[in-house]
């Protein structure tokens, strides 16, 4: 983060990433494939404030979901993040005004991409939460909802709250040091192994590698 005109700016070198190397490699390749389209998607701001480039809705359907997925393993997510995704899904379907053959192909392509990136099971869990909490109709879902995984995800959300700030199952996080936080997060992710084994097992390894990389490459 760094300030620009007194506004905090968070810069990412990639939109998102996965902890499992194979899925992460596929995701980074996909980002490169669609990058030009995202950078050329210009929208006009209201009241004459100019133009900006924004990601397309088909991109956000995948990107925001992957962002939610990553936060499940790095502290937790709250209903406010799920509400954001509800509107992304609704916008995606609004763009597909009629379920024509072309639109069916778009849905099939999206579902194939979610499977390839390792997001299929989590997407089904999210659809269940969006249905139970926000009333998302089944015909508006991007994948069939997964009730079992969805109930587990909703329980995690309700126990932990936004970014897991209310999750005290592994003790009080107030004033914890880096070492304590490392082991707490690693232990926390073990409860996800049965549901999302590749990401849950790779997250501590990724975190260790990234910490080492920063120590060796980032200058102060």
Annotated model-derived regions:
Residues 1-220:
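Conserved NTP-donor binding/palm subdomain of two-metal-ion nucleotidyltransferases/polymerases, i.e.
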């Amino acid at each position: 983060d760094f300030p620009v005109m007194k506004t905090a700016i968070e810069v990412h070198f990639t939109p998102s990433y996965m902890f499992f190397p194979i899925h992460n490699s596929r995701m980074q390749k996909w980002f490169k494939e669609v990058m030009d389209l995202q950078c050329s998607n210009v929208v006009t701001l209201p009241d004459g404030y100019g133009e900006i480039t924004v990601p397309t809705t088909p991109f956000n359907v995948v990107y925001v979901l992957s962002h939610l997925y990553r936060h499940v393993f790095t502290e937790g997510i709250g209903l406010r993040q799920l509400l954001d995704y509800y509107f992304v899904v609704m916008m995606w379907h609004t763009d597909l005004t009629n379920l024509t053959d072309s639109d069916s192909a778009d849905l099939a392509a999206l579902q194939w991409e979610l499977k390839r990136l390792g997001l299929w099971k989590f997407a089904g869990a999210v659809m269940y939460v969006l249905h139970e909490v926000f009333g998302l109709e089944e015909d508006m879902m991007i994948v069939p909802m997964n009730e079992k995984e969805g109930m587990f995800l909703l329980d995690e959300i309700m126990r932990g709250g936004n970014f897991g700030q209310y999750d005290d199952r592994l003790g009080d996080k107030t004033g914890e040091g880096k070492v304590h936080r490392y082991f707490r997060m690693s232990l926390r992710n073990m409860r996800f192994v049965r549901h999302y084994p590749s990401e849950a097992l790779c997250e501590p390894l990724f975190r260790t590698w990234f910490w080492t990389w920063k120590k060796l490459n980032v200058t102060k």
